[in-house]
């Protein structure tokens, strides 16, 4: 028998050849988990030890889920969509991705769900320019620019007293049925003139996020925007009341992601969250089902962070990031005008001001029902045009004094002349600020209207004649003078413009006829010219 010999060099060569020729198997590996329990839009999943927070998971029927709770033995998953087909024992797989949404100009004019899928039956969305994650970071302090450009709402009561600037967060708050959504829709419609100008610096893309509303309400909003020609530059992200809590929770972040794409490309965006009370309630139900510790009013402890990280994404960014802006109009519903409740106080502290709508004013036909005393804009004043700032300087103070004097006058039997004049001026200003829905004013029309009211040109009118007088005056000035054009082009209200406006108002007053059929200015007989003629006849007769 031959002796066995082992050559170390041969062994080394054989190992090297094997390593160099080795190819791993093409068979993919995946972590697979299983549904332990499921119900109420929540699933508890075992397995998946490598799952990340906020990672997307897929169930057997293709439904997506969001990894919300990462516990030692299981994962709490928020189901995004219909959860009727998810049962115990089904497989769950990781995607390795966090939740994101497609973005681009293809979304203009469309109605989509919180995952970016179309709901309007108009086919697939074209013009997709990429994807953006929902939980994107807000711009940091050094990349923000001060708010210095106005965003006109077309509503006299807001643009004059609580102005909004591009990049601002302005809360609209009030009881149900006080006109909160109407203000937001009017603001969107008012951007039509800017859009039709074709100037990218003026154009504003609008996003309306409907959270927990009736499907019929969302359809009505869409129809109103279409009738006004505003859907051309608007995207609706819809999560109606029938949707799962997970969809209502992520809907505002979907809208923000779509808007941030435009903002970082140097464009201007207006986003409406209608309303954040519903999102907070959806987040509360998710947290309670996942057995997170409840806090005040059973909301979880991080409900403030829920809204702060959302609203901080609204900003005017520096030129280094494109110089775009995203203006936020969050809406919060109160109960019995209680602004000191948990969610209202949270959002008030996050935003740059609030427009408080009073149910008593709304029921008294004062619409928009803006409460002057509580409403405030903390940064919008810097963005107000010079013309509007000049004429509206005393408006808010006059109305606030009128409100306090009005309540005092209810108990006073006799008032001095100054108090009566103040009450008269306040009543006429209040009437002047009434405005029907879907009838926005241009900034130059607002300047003329507010100047007319604050300078006492309406004080001798009956209250029912104030709005007809205003409409007639605006038509008269538009057709007979260049005042509106001058204010629009210069954005200033000079002494010459004011003198021309004063003259035009007096001319129109001489032609205005009240609802009672009486002229506002009585024409006096020309006695001074008639007297000398009579005297000459007398002298001629004597001769």
UniProtKB/Swiss-Prot annotation:
GO terms for molecular function: ADP binding; ATP binding; proton-transporting ATP synthase activity, rotational mechanism. GO terms for cellular component: plasma membrane; proton-transporting ATP synthase complex. CDD domains: ATP-synt_F1_alpha_C (cd18113), ATP-synt_F1_alpha_N (cd18116), F1-ATPase_alpha_CD (cd01132). It is an enzyme of class 7 (translocase). ATP binds at residues 174-181. Its EC number is 7.1.2.2. Gene3D superfamilies: 2.40.30.20, ATP synthase alpha/beta chain, C-terminal domain, P-loop containing nucleotide triphosphate hydrolases. The keyword Transcription regulation does not apply. It is found in: Cell membrane. Residues 521-543 are annotated as: Disordered. It catalyses: ATP + H2O + 4 H(+)(in) = ADP + phosphate + 5 H(+)(out). It is a peripheral membrane protein. Its main location: membrane. HAMAP family: ATP_synth_alpha_bact. PANTHER family: ATP SYNTHASE SUBUNIT ALPHA, MITOCHONDRIAL. Produces ATP from ADP in the presence of a proton gradient across the membrane. The alpha chain is a regulatory subunit. F-type ATPases have 2 components, CF(1) - the catalytic core - and CF(0) - the membrane proton channel. CF(1) has five subunits: alpha(3), beta(3), gamma(1), delta(1), epsilon(1). CF(0) has three main subunits: a(1), b(2) and c(9-12). The alpha and beta chains form an alternating ring which encloses part of the gamma chain. CF(1) is attached to CF(0) by a central stalk formed by the gamma and epsilon chains, while a peripheral stalk is formed by the delta and b chains. Belongs to the ATPase alpha/beta chains family. This is ATP synthase subunit alpha.
């Amino acid at each position: 028998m031959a002796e066995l010999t082992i050559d170390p060099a041969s062994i080394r060569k054989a190992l090297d050849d094997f390593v160099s020729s080795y190819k791993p198997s093409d068979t993919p590996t995946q972590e697979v988990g299983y549904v332990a329990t499921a119900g109420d839009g929540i699933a508890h999943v075992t397995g998946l030890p490598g799952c990340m927070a906020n990672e997307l998971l897929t169930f057997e029927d293709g439904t997506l889920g969001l990894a919300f709770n990462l516990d030692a033995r299981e994962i709490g998953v928020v189901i995004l969509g219909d959860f009727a087909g998810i049962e115990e024992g089904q497989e769950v797989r990781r995607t390795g991705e966090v939740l994101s949404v497609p973005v681009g100009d293809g979304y203009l004019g469309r109605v989509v769900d919180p995952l970016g899928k179309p709901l309007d039956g108009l086919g697939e969305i074209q013009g997709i320019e990429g994807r953006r994650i929902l939980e994107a970071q807000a711009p940091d302090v050094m990349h923000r620019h001060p708010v210095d450009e106005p965003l006109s709402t077309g509503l006299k009561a807001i643009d004059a007293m609580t102005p909004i600037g591009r990049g601002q967060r302005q809360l609209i708050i009030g009881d149900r049925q006080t006109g909160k959504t109407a203000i937001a829709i009017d603001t969107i419609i008012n951007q039509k003139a800017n859009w039709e100008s074709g100037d990218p610096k003026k154009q504003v893309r609008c996003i309306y996020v409907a959270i927990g509303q009736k499907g019929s309400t969302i359809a009505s909003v869409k129809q109103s925007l279409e009738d006004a020609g505003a859907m051309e530059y608007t995207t609706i992200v819809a999560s109606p009341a029938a949707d799962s809590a997970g969809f209502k929770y992520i809907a505002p972040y979907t809208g923000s992601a779509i808007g941030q794409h435009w903002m970082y490309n140097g464009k201007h965006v207006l986003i409406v969250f209608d309303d954040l009370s519903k999102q907070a309630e959806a987040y509360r139900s998710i947290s309670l089902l996942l057995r997170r510790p409840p806090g005040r009013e059973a909301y979880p402890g991080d409900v403030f962070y829920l809204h702060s990280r959302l609203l901080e994404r609204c900003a005017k960014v520096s030129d280094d990031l494109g110089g775009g802006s995203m203006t936020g109009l969050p809406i919060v519903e109160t109960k019995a005008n209680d602004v000191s409740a948990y969610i209202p106080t949270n959002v008030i502290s996050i935003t740059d001001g609030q427009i408080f709508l009073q149910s008593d004013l709304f029921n008294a036909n004062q619409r928009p029902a803006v409460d002057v005393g509580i409403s405030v804009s903390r940064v919008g004043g810097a963005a107000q045009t010079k013309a509007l700032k000049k004429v509206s300087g005393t408006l808010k103070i006059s109305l606030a004094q009128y409100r306090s004097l009005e309540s005092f006058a209810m108990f006073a039997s006799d008032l001095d002349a100054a108090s009566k004049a103040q009450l008269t001026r306040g009543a006429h200003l209040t009437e002047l600020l009434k405005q029907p829905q879907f009838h926005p004013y241009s900034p130059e029309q607002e300047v003329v209207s507010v100047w007319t009211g604050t300078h006492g040109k309406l004080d001798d009118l009956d209250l029912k004649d104030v709005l007809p007088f205003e409409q007639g005056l605006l038509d008269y000035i538009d057709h007979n003078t260049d005042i509106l054009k001058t204010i629009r082009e210069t954005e200033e209200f000079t002494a010459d413009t004011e003198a021309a406006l004063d003259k035009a108002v007096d001319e129109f007053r001489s032609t205005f006829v009240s609802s009672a059929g009486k002229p506002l200015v009585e024409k006096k007989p020309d006695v001074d010219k008639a007297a000398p003629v009579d005297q000459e006849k007398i002298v001629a007769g004597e001769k």
